[in-house]
Curated annotation (Swiss-Prot):
Protein name: Putative RNA-guided DNA endonuclease
Pfam families (alphabetical): Cas12f1-like_TNB, HTH_OrfB_IS605, OrfB_IS605
Active site annotation, chain numbering: 188, 272, 353
Tagged with keyword Oxidoreductase: no
Region (Disordered): 202-239, 373-402
Family note: In the N-terminal section; belongs to the transposase 2 family.
Composition bias, Basic and acidic residues: 204-225
Function statement: An RNA-guided dsDNA endonuclease. When guided by an RNA derived from the right-end element of its insertion sequence element (IS), cleaves DNA downstream of the transposon-associated motif (TAM). Cleaves supercoiled and linear DNA in a staggered manner 15-21 bases from the TAM yielding 5'-overhangs. Binds reRNA, an approximately 150 nucleotide base sRNA derived from the 3' end of its own gene, the right end (RE) of the insertion sequence (IS) plus sequence downstream of the IS.
Top enzyme category: hydrolase
Keywords, alphabetical: DNA recombination, DNA-binding, Endonuclease, Hydrolase, Metal-binding, Nuclease, Transposable element, Transposition, Zinc
EC number: 3.1.21.-
Residues binding Zn(2+): 325, 328, 344, 346
Comp. bias (Basic residues): 226-239
């Protein structure tokens, strides 16, 4: 059955000098309003144990605009400023619900520069987008068309560290489920092989960062040789950002193609609930694990399975997938990472990764059949339940990566 989802379509655009200046001012004002509101909420929370609502923050913004030193806030569109306060409200709601850490201040150099416009702050006419406080429509490079008849409800403009400008259009889209199939696959994440499938196929890790490591190192050396605060250092930093952007784009493209293929070919996809944050504490493997981007792959699998009528099952991270003999069910005592093949007492010879993928699939199918839980829990291994089923949230709960 077809379903309606909110989907973001991201495009690159090239602003005029006037548009770039206006948007840069807007980015600065958005960052200032966010940080001042966060400062006020922090004083209220840590000083008085008092929570500040969005309405109170919005009233404070009105007062700021009346002061002489912050009168320039009235020169940009008010909608991005209000949206910044809404995002801060969401950040605090997640903090109080213990879903995230305490909100952090936005940095001019490190944070992504962005501004969000709702329907009242932009004009969409004949496929052209004009933002508030700008006279001309944006010069957007339409790399793919919007859904037929779709109109954006929210527009987010951003600029990355490499100096590239992007616009993201949030639209309603109709998703048709993929044709049903009986195939199922278990996925074991790795470093040498990015993923190993229960079919025995190994997807080689492209190692995107390593391909540009020499270029990145040279660009970083150039930065270190420039005087701090100089224009040349700023140019050198932008070159570093361009290399990072190249790596990120290449990685994202590969993961999208891989996740789409896995979802299209299989009715059930089973993965492990890996805690990447803890794995990154391994100094020798941290760079390789970060480059593999397992979390990003999982995120793509989650929303694509939800879109196309597939089932995603996540088994417990403590399930001994590599040490469990898929033939007799015996669990081996120790299995160091350097051991890629091992022989069970029953005589079965196992490839470490293929055996793990097959055990993951078997555990996932068992969890799917019995409906064992909703979300992975660390305690499940102590209570004898080695795997659980996870129902991914619908894409309408947030904007997926595209």
């Amino acid at each position: 059955m077809m379903q309606q989802v909110k989907r973001a379509f991201k495009y690159r655009f090239y602003p005029t000098d006037e548009q770039a200046a206006e948007l840069s001012r807007t980015f600065g004002c958005v960052r200032l309003v966010y940080n001042k509101a966060l400062e006020g909420r922090t004083r209220a929370w840590y000083g008085e144990q008092r929570r500040v609502s969005y309405v109170q923050s919005s009233a404070a913004l009105t007062e700021w605009k009346k002061t002489e030193e912050l009168a320039f806030l009235s020169e940009v569109s008010s909608v991005p400023l209000q949206q910044a306060l809404r995002h801060l409200q969401t950040a605090f709601a997640n903090f109080f619900a213990k879903r995230s850490k305490y909100p952090r201040y936005k940095s001019r150099k490190k944070s992504r520069a962005s501004a969000e416009y709702t329907r009242s702050a932009f004009t969409w006419r004949n496929g052209q987008l004009t933002l508030a406080k700008t006279a001309e429509p944006l010069d957007i490079r339409w790399s793919r068309p919007l859904p037929e008849g779709a109109e954006p409800t929210t527009v987010t403009v951003s600029r990355d560290r490499a100096g590239r400008w992007f616009v993201s259009l949030l639209c309603e889209d109709t998703i048709t489920p993929a044709p049903a199939t009986t195939a199922a696959v278990g996925i074991d994440a790795g470093i040498t092989s990015l993923v190993t499938l229960s079919t025995g196929e190994k997807i080689t890790n492209p190692k995107h960062e390593r391909r540009d490591r020499a270029r990145l190192a040279k660009a970083q050396r150039d930065v270190s040789r420039k005087a701090k605060g100089s224009a040349n250092r700023k140019k050198a930093r932008r070159k570093v950002a361009r290399v990072h952007a190249r790596i990120t784009d290449r990685r994202c493209d590969f993961l999208h193609k891989l996740s789409t293929r896995l979802v299209r070919e299989n009715q059930t996809v089973v993965i492990e609930d890996l805690t990447v944050r803890n794995l990154l504490k391994n100094g020798k493997l941290a760079r390789a694990i970060s480059d593999a981007a397992w979390t990003e792959l999982r995120s793509m699998l989650e929303y694509k399975c939800a879109w196309y009528g597939r089932e995603l099952v996540v088994i417990d991270r403590w399930f001994p997938s590599s040490k469990l003999c898929g033939t007799c069910g015996t669990v081996r005592g120790k299995l160091p990472l350097n051991v890629r093949e091992w022989t069970c007492d029953c005589g079965a010879v196992h490839d470490r990764d293929v055996n793990a993928a097959r055990n993951i699939l078997a555990a996932g199918l068992a969890a799917s059949a019995c409906g064992d839980g909703i979300r992975p829990q660390r305690e499940s291994s102590r209570t004898g339940r080695s795997s659980v089923k996870q129902e991914p949230q619908r894409a309408t709960a947030g904007i997926p990566r595209l």
